[in-house]
Amino acid sequence: ATVYNNEGTQVXVGGYFDVV
């Protein structure tokens, strides 16, 4: 699982988790 923001870059804040 990777954390992305709304632009698809890897961040931890204000984003979402790729649960794959």
Curated annotation (Swiss-Prot):
**Membrane topology for this entry?**
Multi-pass membrane protein
Q: Does this entry carry the keyword rRNA-binding? A: no
> Keywords of this protein's UniProt record, alphabetized?
Cell outer membrane, Disulfide bond, Ion transport, Membrane, Porin, Transmembrane, Transmembrane beta strand, Transport
Q: Which domain of life is it from?
A: Bacteria
Which stretches are annotated as coiled coil?
A: none
Annotated localization: Cell outer membrane
GO BP terms: namely:
monoatomic ion transport
Looking at the UniProt record for this protein, which Gene Ontology cellular component terms does it annotate, in alphabetical order?
cell outer membrane; pore complex
The entry lists its GO molecular-function terms as: porin activity
In the record, the note on similarity to other proteins reads: Belongs to the Gram-negative porin family.
Please explain the role this protein plays, according to its UniProt record.
Answer: Structural rigidity of the outer membrane of elementary bodies and porin forming, permitting diffusion of solutes through the intracellular reticulate body membrane.
**How does it associate, per the subunit comment?**
Disulfide bond interactions within and between MOMP molecules and other components form high molecular-weight oligomers.
Q: What is this protein called?
A: Major outer membrane protein
Q: Which organism is it from?
A: Avibacterium paragallinarum (Haemophilus gallinarum)
Organism placement in taxonomy: Bacteria, Pseudomonadati, Pseudomonadota, Gammaproteobacteria, Pasteurellales
